[in-house]
Regions:
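N-terminal Rossmann-like NAD(P) cofactor-binding subdomain of oxidoreductases
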Residues: 2-211, 242-243, 310, 315, ...
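Charged docking surfaces used in two-component/phosphorelay signaling
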Residues: 193-367
Length: 367
C-alpha cells in the first residue's frame, strides 16, 4: 500500500468488493469521512496486486472522480481473510459472489474479530443478524450480542443493509405506524444502477422498460417485516402486519428508485396529520447528529409533479427520502409517491450510516 495517510482518531476501513459499482460508492463516500478512512481495498484474484487506479480507472462508474488518496492502494485478494482483516478496524462488504460464498466470506471476516457491514443479501435472514435502516430500527443492533455468542467472537459481527427497493416506501410508512397500516401495495420503478449497470454497458435499457427484476418482489414484501419485527429470546421475530404486495420494474434511469404506494390503516389518519408526521419525523441518526444522517430525513413536496429522480434523488447528499402526491384513494385509504437514491441511501450510504450508528453505540472501536 502506498500513499495513504491516516488522520489521528479515524478507524481504518477495508472495502471488500471495492471495484464494483457499490464498492466504488463506498470508496467515494468515505473520501472525507470524519470517522473512517479507507486503508485497504480487496477484490477478486484478477484485481489483486494492481493499484486501485490500474484496476478501476477504465470502469469507474460514478459521476464524481476517483478520490486521489485511494488511487495507489494495492488491491488485496478478498479471500485472504486474515491478511485483509489484520489491517483494518471495520469492513464494508460489497462483493459480487454466490450467496453461500458470501455467507462464508463474511462470517470468516467476522470471526477475525472484525465487524462487517454488508451490502449483500446473503445475511439478511439469520434471526441474529440485524438488517437495519438506522432511522427505523436502530434498536435491532442489540441482537449483535446474541450473534457474537453464536460466532464465538468478542468484537466481530455482521450487520446488513436491506434491499434498495424498500428504501423509499418503508421510511415513508414508518412515521405512520401508530395508525396500524394493514395493507400496502407498492410498485417500484428501479434505476439501472441497481443492477450495477450504466447505459454504456446496458444499451438494451435505452428506450425500454423491463417488468421483472429477479428476486426483488420477494425481498420488497418480506424484508420490511423483519425491519418492523421485535427481538425475542435472542432472535428477531418478523412483524405480521402490514400485508405487502409489490411489483418491481426496471426503468431507463441512471439512479433513483421510485415507488407508487397504496396503503390502508386500522385507524385512518387525516391527510394533514400524515404530512405533519413525515415532516416532523426524526430518527436516532438525526438526534445523534451522525455524519451521514440527512436533515430532514423525509421531505414532502406539495407540487403535483414531485418527487422526480433527476431533481430529488440527491436530496440530503443522496440520503434523504422524498415523498409527494399524497391523495385519498378509491380502493385503499391513501396513495403517494416516494423516492430514494438507490446506490447512496439504498446501498453504500446506508451502509456507512449503519457503521456510524454502530460506532456511536459502542459496537465498533479501534482494534
Amino acid at each position: 500500500m502506498k500513499g495513504v495517510f491516516i488522520m489521528a482518531g479515524k478507524l481504518k476501513v477495508g472495502v471488500v468488493g471495492g471495484t464494483g459499482m457499490v464498492g466504488q460508492r463506498f470508496v467515494a463516500l468515505l473520501e472525507n469521512h470524519p470517522w473512517f478512512e479507507v486503508t485497504t481495498i480487496a477484490a477478486s484474484k484478477n484485481s489483486a496486486g494492481k493499484t486501485y487506479e490500474e484496476s478501476v480507472s477504465h470502469r469507474w462508474k460514478l459521476p464524481t472522480s476517483m478520490p486521489e488518496k485511494v488511487k495507489n492502494i494495492v488491491i488485496k485478494d478478498a479471500s485472504n481473510v486474515e491478511e485483509v482483516a489484520g489491517e483494518v478496524d471495520l469492513i464494508f462488504c460489497a462483493v459480487d459472489m454466490k450467496k453461500d460464498e458470501i455467507r462464508a466470506l463474511e462470517e470468516a471476516y467476522a470471526k477475525t474479530e472484525t465487524p462487517v457491514v454488508s451490502n449483500n443479501s446473503a445475511h439478511r435472514w439469520p434471526p441474529d443478524v440485524p438488517m437495519v435502516i438506522p432511522e427505523i430500527n436502530p434498536d435491532h443492533i442489540r441482537i449483535i450480542e446474541a450473534q457474537r455468542k453464536r460466532l464465538g467472537t468478542k468484537r466481530g459481527f455482521i450487520a446488513v443493509k436491506p434491499n434498495c427497493s424498500i428504501q423509499s416506501y418503508v421510511p415513508a410508512l414508518h412515521p405512520l405506524m401508530d395508525y396500524a397500516p394493514v395493507k400496502v401495495v407498492a410498485c417500484t420503478y428501479q434505476a439501472i444502477s441497481g443492477a450495477g449497470k450504466t447505459f454504456a454497458d446496458w444499451p438494451e435499457m435505452v428506450d425500454n422498460v423491463i417488468p421483472y427484476i429477479g428476486g426483488e418482489e420477494e425481498k420488497s414484501e418480506q424484508e420490511p417485516l423483519k425491519i418492523w419485527g421485535q427481538i425475542k429470546d435472542g432472535a428477531i421475530v418478523k412483524a405480521e402486519k402490514p400485508l405487502i404486495s409489490t411489483q418491481c420494474i426496471r426503468v431507463p434511469v441512471t439512479d433513483g428508485h421510485m415507488a407508487a404506494v397504496y396503503v390502508s390503516f386500522e385507524k385512518k389518519p387525516d391527510k394533514e396529520e400524515i404530512i405533519r408526521r413525515w415532516r416532523a419525523f426524526e430518527g436516532v441518526p438525526q438526534k445523534l447528529d451522525l455524519p451521514s444522517a440527512p436533515k430532514p430525513f423525509i421531505t414532502y413536496y406539495e407540487e403535483e409533479n414531485r418527487p422526480q429522480t433527476r431533481l430529488d434523488r440527491d436530496l440530503g447528499n443522496g440520503m434523504g427520502i422524498s415523498v409527494g402526491r399524497l391523495r385519498e384513494d378509491t380502493l385503499f385509504d391513501y396513495k403517494f409517491i416516494s423516492l430514494s437514491h438507490n446506490t447512496v441511501r439504498g446501498a453504500a450510504g446506508g451502509g456507512v450510516l449503519i457503521a456510524e450508528l454502530l460506532k456511536a453505540e459502542g459496537y465498533i472501536q479501534a482494534k
